[in-house]
């Protein structure tokens, strides 16, 4: 057994539609509970009691004065809807701004227009204008609220620039090595120039010794000039060990042990001259340095 409850929907009346009754089905007591009674009379009384209870509940719910919760919700909803409709219909400018603000805050689609009780979407031109206006407002608000971009340090060279950086480092190392080699060459050149100056000085000495006999100065030949390297420590060795002075006539030989009975030293024939020896060494050193570098 079922009890049918009829409720009218008043919300659709504000939209111009005819209200249609809504039917809710309420179930009575289950049959197995009714069959569980001990006697047919008790079962009949149970059925009648269940029916009476269902009728009382349905009549209580159908009375609007007792259903305070549902009635209050309906009233609040209808009042709010009526106020919103009056507000939107009285101010077209505020309608557009309010719709735009609501769309920005909630992210919903623009509101629908009701024509003849049916919802119709807005025109394409109006929707484009609203979208453009929303975009302008968003960009202006973003430019005001956004702080200036933070400055980050420049990133280092990436993997693609690693080869270029290695080439630059290798070229710098080559330049440094070339600089060191240039400094070494400059040092060698300065040493060679110094040796050349000494060689020129020795050549001038030789020229002076060749011109000395013509001017009347004493002259000793290179072959007969005594040499301290061939005396081998005899008694009659010279006190001065510089044979070059004796060769050039700048010094006279003196006896190391003077006296009456002192015998003159035995002169040994020279096989080479100290001056020739030093000059030849300088020439060989200069030639060897040039060949080396």
UniProtKB/Swiss-Prot annotation:
GO molecular function, one term: structural constituent of cytoskeleton
Chief place where the protein resides: nucleus
Pfam families to which the protein is assigned, alphabetical: Spc29
Organism: Eremothecium gossypii (strain ATCC 10895 / CBS 109.51 / FGSC 9923 / NRRL Y-1056) (Yeast)
Entry GO terms, CC: central plaque of spindle pole body; cytoplasm; nucleus
Sequence similarity: Belongs to the SPC29 family.
Keyword line: Cytoplasm, Cytoskeleton, Nucleus
Primary gene name: SPC29
Record's compositionally biased regions (Low complexity): 116-125
Role of this protein: Component of the spindle pole body (SPB) required for the proper execution of spindle pole body (SPB) duplication. Links the central plaque component SPC42 to the inner plaque component SPC110.
Sequence ranges of Polar residues compositional bias: 264-276
Region of interest called Disordered, as start-end residue ranges on this chain: 87-165, 212-238, 254-276
Protein name: Spindle pole component 29
Transmembrane region(s): none
Example of a GO biological process term: spindle pole body duplication
Location in the cell: Nucleus; Cytoplasm, Cytoskeleton, Microtubule organizing center, Spindle pole body
Domain of life: Eukaryota
Regions annotated as coiled coil: none
InterPro entries cross-referenced by the UniProt entry: Spc29
Biased composition regions of type Pro residues, renumbered to the chain: 146-158
């Amino acid at each position: 057994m079922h009890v049918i409850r009829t409720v009218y929907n008043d919300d659709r009346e504000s939209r111009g539609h005819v209200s249609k009754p809504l039917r809710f089905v309420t179930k009575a007591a289950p049959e197995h509970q009714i069959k569980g009674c001990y006697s047919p009379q008790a079962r009949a009384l149970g059925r009648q009691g269940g029916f009476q209870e269902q009728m009382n509940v349905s009549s209580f719910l159908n009375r609007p004065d007792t259903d305070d919760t549902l009635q209050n919700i309906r009233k609040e909803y209808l009042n709010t809807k009526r106020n919103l409709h009056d507000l939107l219909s009285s101010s077209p400018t505020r309608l557009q701004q309010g719709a735009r603000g609501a769309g920005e805050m909630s992210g919903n689609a623009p509101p629908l227009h009701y024509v003849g009780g049916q919802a119709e979407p807005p025109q394409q031109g109006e929707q484009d204008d609203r979208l453009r206006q929303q975009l302008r407002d968003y960009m202006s608000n973003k430019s005001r609220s956004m702080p200036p971009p933070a400055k980050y340090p420049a990133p280092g060279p990436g993997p693609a620039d690693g080869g270029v950086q290695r080439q630059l480092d290798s070229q710098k190392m080559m330049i440094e090595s070339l600089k060191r080699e240039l400094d070494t060459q400059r040092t060698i050149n300065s040493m060679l120039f110094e040796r050349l100056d000494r060689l020129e000085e020795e050549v001038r000495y030789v020229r002076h010794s060749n011109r000395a006999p013509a001017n009347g100065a004493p002259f000793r030949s290179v072959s007969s000039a005594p040499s301290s390297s061939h005396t081998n420590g005899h008694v009659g060795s010279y006190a001065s060990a510089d044979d070059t002075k004796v060769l050039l006539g700048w010094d006279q030989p003196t006896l190391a042990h003077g006296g009456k009975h002192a015998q003159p030293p035995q002169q040994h024939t020279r096989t080479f001259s100290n001056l020739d020896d030093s000059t030849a060494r300088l020439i060989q050193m200069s030639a060897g340095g040039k060949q080396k570098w």
